[in-house]
């Protein structure tokens, strides 16, 4: 088994606490509302929403995939960190066992947020991850993030 790690960093004008509430804590409600073509629904299969929880994410009509399951490892509301693994679903393909994700939102000096993400692809055997697969995932995540950011700018009184 190989492990391929990819890191990404980008910024937002939205303050970290507000962004964390929308992007992590309420994503299961917010994303289907603002991007139903991407995510149809999210449901908790096991747990209470905290560490150890298993969630099923059903993709919308505009997606190439049907569903994935996430296992939450940690949610730190004070330090704005979140980690989970994609453990099941057609987005994994035959060559990937799981994908670990870590997200950290850091308050930026200008009042916005620096978003740091790490993705670790755990492959089956000696399979290498194709760069275009990672790039496509980053582009979808970036688009979804921009939708959330736009929603927060259009609704400044929410998630305070």
Curated annotation (Swiss-Prot):
GO CC list: cytoplasm; nucleus
GO molecular function list: abscisic acid binding; protein phosphatase inhibitor activity; signaling receptor activity
The entry's keywords: Allergen, Pathogenesis-related protein, Plant defense
Pfam families to which the protein is assigned, alphabetical: Bet_v_1
UniProt superkingdom: Eukaryota
GO biological process, one term: abscisic acid-activated signaling pathway
UniProt-listed SMART domains: Bet_v_1
Gene3D superfamilies: 3.30.530.20
SUBUNIT field: Monomer.
Family: Belongs to the BetVI family.
PANTHER family: OS08G0374000 PROTEIN-RELATED, STRESS-INDUCED PROTEIN SAM22
Protein name: Major strawberry allergen Fra a 1-B
């Amino acid at each position: 088994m190989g492990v391929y790690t990819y890191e990404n960093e980008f910024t937002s004008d939205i303050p970290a606490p507000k962004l964390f509430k929308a992007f992590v804590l309420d994503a299961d409600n917010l994303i289907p509302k603002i991007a139903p073509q991407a995510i149809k629904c999210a449901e908790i299969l096991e747990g209470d929403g905290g560490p150890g929880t298993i969630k099923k994410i059903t993709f919308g009509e505009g997606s190439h995939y049907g569903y994935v399951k996430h296992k939450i490892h940690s949610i730190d509301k004070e330090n704005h960190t979140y980690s989970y693994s994609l453990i099941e679903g057609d987005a994994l393909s035959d060559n990937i066992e799981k994908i670990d994700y870590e997200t950290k939102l850091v308050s930026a000096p200008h009042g916005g947020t620096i978003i740091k993400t790490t993705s670790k692809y755990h492959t089956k055997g000696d399979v290498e991850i194709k760069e275009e697969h990672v790039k496509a995932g980053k582009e979808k995540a970036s688009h979804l993030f921009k939708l959330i950011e736009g929603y927060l700018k259009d609704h400044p009184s929410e998630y305070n």
